[in-house]
UniProtKB/Swiss-Prot annotation:
Belongs to the FAM171 family. This is Protein FAM171A1. It comes from Pongo abelii. Keywords: Cell membrane, Glycoprotein, Membrane, Phosphoprotein, Signal, Transmembrane, Transmembrane helix. Residues 22-303 are extracellular. Interacts with ADAM10, NSG1 and OAZ1. Glycans are attached at N190, N194. It comes from the Eukaryota.
Length: 890
């Protein structure tokens, strides 16, 4: 059993093996042997071509080959499977190869195929030093096919020269000639091993060869430029790309090589291709790309796109330009709009002006627009006639802030105040009118007789010899000539009044007391002080910077100290006289057309030439107001201004104490600056200010300042920062606000009352003055006038009297308030008649001793020693310690 089973398995294996081997031996199962007759002839002469090579290709592989005989016929046998496509190719030397497909539907019994070979045309070979050119031998009007390449790319065989070379260039000029080229079936290899066959649509074809003498091809390396003209009926256009194909004789098919460009040469289109080698080339299009690959020039193909981009950019630039023009127009129109705002009616002007950095002028006291007062102001007092000179005295007063050198401070906001809308000072008539029912109120001219005391004051503030300063030496007041200049100025201002005192007899005690009583009334009642205390203290800090307001008046009368520099005031004394208003002397200004400018002055002989020179430069209209010569002025009783100056000089020789540190009521300032006091103060120094500031400023008008600051709580000037106040709103609602950091405390009635209470200690030194004050009724606070006190140059380090020491930069302009400290006489001519009537019986005032005059001059000389310490200050310190307040009448 085992043997029989093994035998069966062997037989089964043998049968399986035979079946497998039989299957493997018959791959072309169904293929039959077929004989094909091929006839080869000349395409141009139709003559048979002998010895032509015939090959049959299937799938790029040769399956059969043969040679034609003398009659050009060849019989080729091969195995053919039905459905396969064969390529029959015939080639011979000096002929363009040709091929044709063969694919029968059924297996034929007999089959014949004819192929015509196109003879290659000889070409003109031209070898240059750098280029080798091959041109078609047929020259004509139309462009000819041409090929050129670099000479160095030619590889000549051994024992071969250029004379042994033969060039052939054949181009298909018609569709029939294109058919003489091999069958146009292209093979597109994608580099992955997968190839696709395409039937090509030819455009043109060319064959180029370079042969040696024995007929072997000569190799050419490098780019070969092939140019072939196209048919006139071609549908191609300029800048079109057409695929180039190369014929491979080993594969019997066309291989894709690259792209050729179509150019326009006159009226003829040409196809140019850069070939890697010589051979058979055809320009044809494949079915995947049935049309030419057209690539137009960027200037024509992208014209619309480029125009759209340029149009968009132009539109954007136009919009930006319009925005820029609009912005510039608004910038240019802003100053005009601001100028138009300043021309608004009087009712809206003050509320429309800028409160922070505007350079416009807003009157400080009682100013009105010309529209409200079209004519000259007439000041009447209950039926009294208008006095001459009142119109000049009622000019608007302005606050200005200037640097010590005379230049405007451009970095500080400007503060402007107008009391034209305040309830307390609603009109000039209410301030200047004397109410008949209030008999205790007297005018400013009641202090002295009308015709004489005013001349005394004019003599004390008349022109003094100012030393000319160049603009670059504005801060160089510490020169050696400064001492003589300052001393001569003090002598000129103080000598007339002191000589007047020497000539005058003893004055009546009661008269002087009456003057001081009327001019500086006693403190108001406790009920009024309590009413002032009711003002909320938090109002000063409750508002933002843009809504701060200037109060309409100070809580209580304070001290008005006129000095050359705020920082020279002793801190201890400065706090004892709170609240105090310190005004630098060299910031007082007056208009050039004031009536008291050119009043003659009696001066020493050594100063007469300087004074006459300055007076000659004044305008002629000012010279005719006071034609009286100085020799006609008669001695008159000394004013209370001189008495106040004498108080200060006597106080400078004594040590200050809490009992005598406080100023008397004659040195106090009422609730706020009034027009009479300011007009009197400014009228005295107009001549000095106008000439001195023009000389010190180099003849150029000083720029307007931007802010003013007043410190009444004892702070030094360096601690007062810059800010601004909404001043206009203060006049309407009576707010008690002040600048956040100006140092002004408007709710300090206790210190003010203490200052008035302590003032009695100073007045005890002059009992005749106090007795006379008690005889006359007291004037209300609203009409009390300000006594300007000038703290002359007393050395600060040697005493604690609170006097100031002028800095070198301030000494040249300290004279601008000197006259204010010498006088408090009447500035309203309309009120001087009453003064004459009330003081006609008053005896002469006691003369001032020569010792007092020498003491004032010695104190000024001692002041120069302290000026040297100011040189060590940096420009920043000088800027931060500059004076706080300036008055200017415009």
């Amino acid at each position: 059993m085992s043997r029989s089973a093994a035998l069966l398995l062997c037989l089964l294996g043998c049968h399986v093996w035979k079946a497998v081997t039989k299957t493997l031996r018959e791959p072309g199962a169904g293929a039959q042997e077929v004989t094909l007759k091929v006839h080869i002839s000349d395409a141009s002469t139709h003559q048979p071509v002998a010895d032509a090579l015939i090959e049959i290709f299937t799938n790029q592989a040769s399956i059969a080959s043969g040679t034609s005989g003398t009659d050009g016929v060849a019989f080729i046998k091969f195995q053919y499977k039905l459905g396969s496509q064969l390529i029959v190719t015939a080639s011979k030397h000096a002929y363009v190869p040709n091929s044709a497909p063969w694919k029968p539907i059924r297996l034929p019994v007999f089959s014949s195929l004819s192929l015509g070979l196109l003879p290659e045309r000889s070409a003109t070979l031209m070898v240059y030093e750098d280029v080798v050119q091959i041109v078609s031998g047929f020259q004509g009007a139309r462009p000819q096919p041409r090929v050129h390449f670099q000479r160095r790319a030619l590889r000549l065989p051994e024992n071969t020269s250029y004379s042994d070379l033969t060039a052939f260039l054949t181009a298909a000029s018609s569709p029939s000639e294109v058919d003489s080229f091999p069958y146009l079936r292209g093979l597109d290899g994608n580099g992955t091993g997968n190839s696709t066959r395409h039937d090509l649509t030819p455009v043109t074809a060319v064959s180029v060869h370079l042969l040696s003498s024995n007929g072997t091809p000569v190799l050419v390396d490098g780019p070969i430029y092939v140019t072939v003209p196209l048919a006139t009926q071609s549908s191609l256009r300029h800048n079109a790309y057409v695929t180039a194909w190369r014929f491979d004789q080993k594969l019997g098919t066309w291989l894709k090589s690259g792209l050729g460009l179509v150019h326009q040469e006159g009226s003829q289109l040409t196809w140019t291709y850069i070939a890697p080698q010589l051979g058979y080339w055809v320009a044809a299009m494949s079915p995947p790309i049935p049309g030419p690959v057209v690539t137009q020039d960027i200037t024509t193909y992208h014209t619309v796109f480029l125009l759209a981009i340029l149009g968009g950019m132009a539109f954007i630039l136009l919009v930006l330009l319009c925005l820029l023009l609009y912005y510039c127009r608004r910038k240019c129109m802003k100053p005009r709009q601001h100028h138009r705002k300043l021309q608004l009616p009087a009712g809206l002007e003050s509320s429309k002006r800028d409160q922070s950095t505007s350079m416009s002028h807003i009157n400080l006291l009682f100013s009105r627009r010309a529209s409200e007062f079209p004519g000259p102001l007439s000041v009447t007092s209950h039926g009294r006639p208008e006095a001459p000179g009142t119109k000049e005295l009622m000019s608007g007063v302005h606050l200005e802030m200037m640097s010590p050198g005379g230049e405007g401070d451009l970095h500080t906001p400007m503060l402007k105040l107008s009391y034209s809308t305040s309830q307390e000072f609603s009109s000039r008539e209410e301030l200047l009118s004397c109410k008949e029912e209030d008999k205790s109120q007297i005018s400013f001219d009641n202090l002295t007789p009308s015709g004489t005391l005013r001349k005394d004051y004019h003599k004390s503030v008349e022109v003094f010899p100012l030393k000319a300063r160049k603009s670059m030496e504005r801060e160089g007041y510490e020169s050696s000539g400064n001492d003589d200049y300052r001393g001569s100025y003090n002598t000129v201002l103080s000598q007339p009044l002191f000589e007047k005192q020497d000539r005058e007899g003893p004055a009546s005690t009661g008269s002087k007391l009456t003057i001081q009583e009327h001019l500086y009334p006693a403190p108001s009642s406790p009920e009024k002080e309590q009413l002032l205390d009711r003002r909320p203290t938090e109002c000063m800090m409750s508002r933002s910077v843009d809504h701060l307001e200037r109060p309409t008046s100070f809580p209580q009368p304070g001290q008005l100290i006129c000095c050359s520099s705020v920082d020279q005031v002793n801190d201890s004394v400065y706090r004892k006289v709170l609240p105090a208003l310190v005004i630098p002397a060299h910031y007082m200004k007056l208009p050039g057309d004031h009536s008291y400018v050119s009043q003659p002055l009696v001066v020493p002989a050594d100063q007469q030439l300087e004074i006459e020179r300055l007076q000659a430069e004044l305008s002629n209209p000012h010279a005719g107001i006071f034609p009286h010569p100085s020799s006609q002025i008669q001695p008159q009783p000394l004013s209370s201004q001189a008495i106040s100056q004498q108080h200060l000089q006597d106080a400078g020789t004594r040590e200050w104490s809490p009992q005598n540190a406080s100023m008397s009521e004659s040195l106090s300032i009422p609730a706020s600056l009034n027009d009479a006091a300011l007009a009197q103060m400014n009228s005295e120094v107009q001549l000095l200010t106008e000439k001195a500031l023009m000389e010190l400023g180099g003849g150029k008008p000083l720029p307007h300042p931007r802010a003013w600051f007043v410190s009444l709580d004892g702070r030094s000037n360096a601690h007062v920062r810059h800010s601004y106040i909404d001043l206009q709103r203060a006049g309407r609602n009576g707010s008690n606000d002040a600048s956040l950091d100006s140092g002004v405390d408007m709710n300090e009635p206790k210190s003010a009352r203490k200052g008035r209470g302590d003032a009695l200690s100073l007045q005890q030194n002059y009992p005749p003055v106090q007795e006379h004050q008690q005889k006359e009724p007291r004037a209300p606070d609203s009409t009390a006038y300000t006594q300007l006190v000038y703290l002359d140059d007393v050395e600060q380090s040697g005493s604690e009297c609170g006097t100031t020491v002028c800095t070198p930069e301030d000494s040249a302009l300290r004279c601008l308030l000197e006259g204010s400290s010498r006088r408090s006489g009447g500035q309203l001519p309309s009120l001087q008649e009453e003064t004459t009537r009330r003081t006609a019986d008053a005896p002469s005032e006691p003369a001032v001793s020569p010792h007092q005059r020498r003491s004032a001059h010695e104190e000024e000389e001692d002041d120069d020693d302290d000026d040297q310490g100011e040189d060590k200050k940096s420009p920043w310190q000088k800027r931060e310690e500059r004076p706080l307040m300036a008055f200017n009448i415009k």
